Amino acid sequence: MRNTKMVSLSRVKLFCIGTALMLIMLVAAPTTAAHAQSVFVPGNASGYFGNPVDQAVPFVSALTVSGPGRITVTYVSGLVTLNSHGDTTGPNGTSCDSCKGMQFPLHEARGSGFGKANNVGALIGVFVPQSRVLRKGFSAIDGTKDALRVGVMPGGLFLIGEGKAFDVTEAGTLFLGINDTIVGDNSGGFNVTVAGP
């Protein structure tokens, strides 16, 4: 009889431990998923990058992280209308043979341009360290132009397109924008999800 009681008590203990572990997993799962968020990037958010430019529309703050980890950006839906003629593109952008004399944001990032343009209107991003974002006067526009004292340096711009996962080594903010330079006639935008540490 005593042996039967011990076996029953052991089973009850195991059941309680198993139930507790299941509850912990259920509570932890939504916490992890909570780091993913939806972001809309308007079709005119060029960050004042490129040459010539017509509007200083800042990049969109998409995700702020407090330390190292992996950030994932995934295109969900949307198109950008690039001009008054109604030309549209998806997140990978389009090529432009008639854009000679224009430097797009990704060209500026590489220190090139003024020739054939690829990825025009594409979804692009930049990760800015927290130390720069917190400086007085910071805005998510081109920091090499006279528009402000503290901005984003173009060398950090990168193509996201339909999606990108990348690692960051420090606290900071991911900003998203559009690879275009004349944006006054742009409309539409991209819906994306962003997840991070």
PLM region descriptions:
Residues 21-24, 164:
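Generic detector of short alpha-helix boundary/capping microenvironments
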